[in-house]
Each structure stands twice: as structure tokens, then as C-alpha cells.
Amino acid sequence: MAGYRKLGRPTDQRKAMLRNLVTSFLKHGKIETTETRAKETRSLAEKMITLAKRGDLHARRQVLAFVTEEEVVKNLFDNIAPKYAERNGGYTRMYKVGPRRGDGAEVVILELV
């Protein structure tokens, strides 16, 4: 079945977690998280970057509706999006770090290319 991963949470918690992960990712340029969370975060972050490349007011408002910090949105539109002006998708890279010590979950580093 196509769509999205449930990540073992109710819808509102999952959306809040992914919004926070995307905001942190765009703020810092990289995050360390589990592989499944990173795959969902990657998908949403790439959509935000593609919107930012459009650069119009409507795109800015759409990004503001998802990303939780205005400074991150400003940085996304002013610095990150112009860097990828010539690139069509594939703005992120994932590195496997290995299993997490506590529960053995596969951990990855997600970063901007």
C-alpha cells in the first residue's frame, strides 16, 4: 500500500514529530535519527526545498504552515533554495551509522548534499 509510514504513533503525534524533524533538519543541515524516520523526513524536506525554489509568496506561506520556525523559513528561501536552483530533486544524502545501542534500531545521518 502506497502512502506514508505510520511510525507507531497516532496521526497528530506523527505529524508533529515529522514537522519538528524537518524543522531541525533545515535548521542544522543534518540530523541523526532512525532509518524509517529519516526516509519520511527526507521526503517532506525535499518538498519544502522544492517549494522554496519557486520563491513566491504562496510557496512561502505553504512552507510556513509546515515548518515551525520563521528564521528557518527565511534561511530556506534565502540560502538553501538558491544553492539547489539547478538541481531537480535529490537534495539530501543518508549515511548508515549502525544499530542504536539501546534497542538495535538502525540509525542514519541525514544531511543536505
Curated annotation (Swiss-Prot):
Assigned keywords, A-Z: Ribonucleoprotein, Ribosomal protein
One cellular component term from this protein's GO annotations in UniProt: cytosolic large ribosomal subunit
GO molecular function: structural constituent of ribosome
Gene Ontology BP terms: translation
Domain of life: Bacteria
InterPro entries: Ribosomal_bL17 (IPR000456), Ribosomal_bL17_CS (IPR047859), Ribosomal_bL17_sf (IPR036373)
Keyword Membrane: no
PROSITE patterns listed in its UniProt record: RIBOSOMAL_L17
Pfam families: Ribosomal_L17 (PF01196)
HAMAP family documented for this protein: Ribosomal_bL17
NCBIfam families associated with the record: L17
Similarity-based family: Belongs to the bacterial ribosomal protein bL17 family.
Self-association and partners: Part of the 50S ribosomal subunit. Contacts protein L32.
Protein name according to UniProt: Large ribosomal subunit protein bL17
Species in which this protein is naturally found: Clostridium perfringens (strain 13 / Type A)
